[in-house]
């Protein structure tokens, strides 16, 4: 579990530094799950994205630029750049899985950087958004590869659990979620195809059944894109909160050393109020506040000004 720092400066007796902290995950959820899909497969566009959207989820799709056709008729097994942009416009993360899917640990320094850069440029040109996360082909990486891939990014997938194929029966998938809830962890699921590909399902309804299982636990689990969870957890770990007394409440000033453009994210502040209602403002705007048990959960900008809580 990550921690953030709260510093008191003459606080009132009503709210102490111990009462104020940054939640480990968005909205104070207990853990996080990211659903990721490799290799630009056509049914990511035709099946996976629509099934995620039916449940209010968004996924991360790792694209191999060299495999993506300009028009659908040229390749029926991979989605097009136009379809990728459509998925992005619907809220999914479309990110970098190298240009041609090589073993990155076997490349020269020049070829390594070219595989990353060429796909970054293609993604920006076709999607209109930069790739800020990375997925290693064949899950093969070393320290040099990680360093090259992480330049200008918030995260890379270094560990995953199987979403598809014989490696992921129902009991296995449910166990991954149970363990994440118990440990307060962020986990990332990985698969390629549903109906075709080396790790496809014998019965694709196993995938939608798992989505339904996640939906049933949504009050406890944050199902977020890889980029969103990576940015949130990095900023939550880095930020400090300075708590000072204010009229009828406190002022909480956030400070973080991370780049506000690359790591753009809202955070959730947990305030122990013993069940009392509060109002929160930042930079002249009212902030969203929700309640659960004895806590208030305040959505705030870690790159913004002081938060006043009354």
Language-model features, listed with the residues they occupy:
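Surface-exposed substrate-engagement region within the catalytic domains
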Residues: 148-151, 159, 166-181
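C-terminal domain-boundary segment and adjacent tail
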Residues: 17-27, 53, 59, 63, ...
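C-terminal beta-strand-rich structural cap/linker in extracellular carbohydrate-active enzymes
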Residues: 292-310
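N-terminal pre-catalytic segment of deacetylase/amide-hydrolase enzymes
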Residues: 11-35, 43-47, 76-79, 220-236, ...
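Non-membrane alpha-helical structural segments and their capping/turn regions in soluble enzymes
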Residues: 109-114, 170, 204, 208
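Bacterial N-terminal signal peptides
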Residues: 1-8
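Metal-dependent polysaccharide deacetylase catalytic core of the NodB/CE4 family, i.e.
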Residues: 31-33, 53-155, 159-164, 188-196
């Amino acid at each position: 579990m990550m921690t953030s720092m709260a510093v008191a400066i003459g606080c009132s007796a009503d709210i102490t530094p111990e009462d104020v902290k940054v939640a480990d995950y968005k909205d104070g959820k207990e853990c996080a799950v990211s659903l990721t899909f490799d290799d630009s497969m056509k049914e990511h566009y035709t099946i996976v994205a629509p099934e995620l959207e039916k449940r209010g989820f968004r996924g991360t799709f790792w694209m191999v630029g060299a495999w993506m056709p300009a028009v659908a008729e040229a390749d029926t097994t991979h989605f097009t750049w136009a379809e990728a942009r459509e998925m992005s416009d619907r809220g999914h993360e479309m990110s970098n899985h190298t240009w041609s899917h090589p073993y990155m640990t076997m490349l020269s320094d020049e070829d390594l950087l070219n595989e990353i850069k060429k796909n970054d440029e293609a993604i920006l040109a076709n999607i209109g958004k930069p790739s800020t996360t990375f997925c290693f082909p064949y899950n093969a990486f070393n320290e040099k590869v990680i360093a090259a891939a992480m330049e200008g990014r918030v995260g890379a997938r270094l560990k995953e659990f199987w979403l598809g194929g014989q490696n992921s029966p129902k009991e296995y998938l449910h166990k991954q979620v149970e363990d994440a809830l118990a440990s307060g962890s962020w986990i990332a699921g990985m698969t390629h195809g549903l109906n075709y590909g080396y790790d496809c399902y014998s019965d694709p309804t196993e995938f939608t059944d798992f989505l339904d299982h996640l939906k049933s636990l949504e009050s406890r689990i944050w199902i977020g894109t890889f980029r969103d969870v990576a940015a949130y957890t990095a900023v939550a770990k880095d930020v400090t909160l300075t708590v000072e007394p204010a009229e009828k409440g406190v002022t909480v000033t956030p400070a973080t050393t991370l780049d506000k453009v690359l790591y753009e994210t809202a955070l959730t502040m947990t305030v122990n109020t013993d069940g009392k209602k509060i109002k929160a403002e930042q930079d002249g705007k009212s902030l969203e506040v929700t309640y659960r048990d004895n806590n208030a959960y305040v959505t705030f900008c870690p790159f913004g000004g002081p938060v006043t809580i009354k």
